[in-house]
């Protein structure tokens, strides 16, 4: 019996090894295996968005002008969602709707599904890029884990929410004013601001901004350079080998301010990671709930009392009336294909009126 010792060696010209060597080579812009997903998808998503906002109308899907060619500016231009009648069709260029006609495909809203799907895979490719680079230089993968927060929000808002509704029509269009319209829609039809998952998301994002500002200011406050005292600008010298700020001084400062302070850098920075990412995850979970039409908090007793007593009104009941107003006024404007008509007497008014 023959026993072979050592590693099994492949042929030198193995195609996988050649590709791996080229993709992961040290260059100015790292490509990597993740780049095979990231770069094409990012290119097509951005290219589709610039094309749509420059040339493509939303007249056939929303009855709106949405391109620079029609007179919109950066804040009002958008790549709009497909018509409600198209439901959840992928709207492939070669599909039964467009039948290979590029003009018809753009008119039907095909660019929206094109941008949304390529954008989602582009974001996933960027997260995989962070995993791949972290593995290459032997780092932990927390950057990629952190980036899962924005991905979760994007996928939940642009893909899962409209999948739970009647079609892509109810997703946000890709534009600044279009996103604002979608926020108003979320408030009017889902009372989103009173949703506990939205509250957790706001706490996470604003809390992270506060932590970031405090952390940056504290590090700047305690910069030092050995032998030169507290000289902020000399401490920026990148050739200094030692640590450039004093954790001990920072701890003493915040202990006096709040009575408590972080004494461990790892816990401090994990907390700065945990707060925003958890907030984004919670927001994404909330939007998934809205896709299923789960309700936010309802304080029915206040609504009943406000209906019975003209002198009783709370900020909650006023907001509920505002939501009714948004629904009544917005539905007719936002869904012209439904031919909704609300007579004046059914439009909501506050108790003062």
Swiss-Prot record:
In the record, which positions carry Phosphothreonine? Answer: 2
| An annotated Gene Ontology molecular function | chlorophyll binding
Q: Which residues bind pheophytin a?
A: 130, 143
Which residues of the sequence carry a binding annotation for chlorophyll a ChlzD2? 118
A GO biological-process term = photosynthetic electron transport in photosystem II
Q: What is its EC number?
A: 1.10.3.9
The protein in question is named Photosystem II D2 protein
């Amino acid at each position: 019996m023959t026993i072979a010792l050592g590693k099994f060696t492949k042929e030198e010209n193995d195609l996988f090894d050649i590709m791996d060597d080229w993709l992961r080579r040290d260059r100015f812009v790292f490509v990597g295996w993740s780049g095979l997903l990231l770069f094409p998808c990012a290119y097509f998503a951005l290219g589709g968005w610039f094309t749509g906002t420059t040339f493509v109308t939303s007249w056939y899907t929303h009855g709106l002008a949405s391109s620079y060619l029609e007179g919109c500016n950066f804040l009002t231009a958008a790549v709009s969602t497909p018509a409600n009648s198209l439901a959840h069709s992928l709207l492939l260029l070669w599909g039964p709707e467009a039948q290979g006609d590029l003009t018809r495909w753009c008119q039907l809203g095909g660019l929206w599904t094109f941008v949304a799907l390529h954008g989602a895979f582009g974001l996933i490719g960027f997260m995989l890029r962070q995993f791949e680079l972290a593995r290459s230089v032997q780092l932990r993968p927390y950057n990629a884990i952190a980036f899962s927060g924005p991905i979760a929000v994007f996928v939940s808002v642009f893909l899962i929410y409209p999948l739970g509704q009647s079609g892509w029509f109810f997703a946000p269009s890709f534009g600044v004013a279009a996103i604002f319209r979608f926020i108003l829609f979320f408030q009017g039809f889902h009372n989103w601001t009173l949703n506990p998952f939205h509250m957790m998301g706001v706490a996470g994002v604003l809390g992270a901004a506060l932590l970031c500002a405090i952390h940056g200011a504290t590090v700047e406050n305690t910069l030092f350079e050995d032998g030169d005292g507290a000289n902020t600008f000399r401490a920026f010298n990148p050739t200094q080998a030692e640590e450039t700020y004093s954790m001990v001084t920072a701890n003493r400062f915040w202990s006096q301010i709040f009575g408590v302070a972080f004494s461990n850098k790892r816990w401090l920075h994990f907390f700065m990671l945990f707060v925003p990412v958890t907030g984004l995850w919670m927001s994404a979970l909330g939007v998934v709930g809205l896709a299923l039409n789960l309700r936010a908090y309802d304080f029915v007793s206040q609504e009943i009392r406000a209906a019975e007593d003209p002198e009783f009104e709370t900020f909650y009941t006023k907001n509920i009336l505002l939501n009714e107003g948004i629904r009544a006024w917005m539905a007719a404007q936002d869904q012209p294909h439904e031919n909704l008509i609300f007579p004046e007497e059914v439009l909501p008014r506050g108790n003062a009126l």
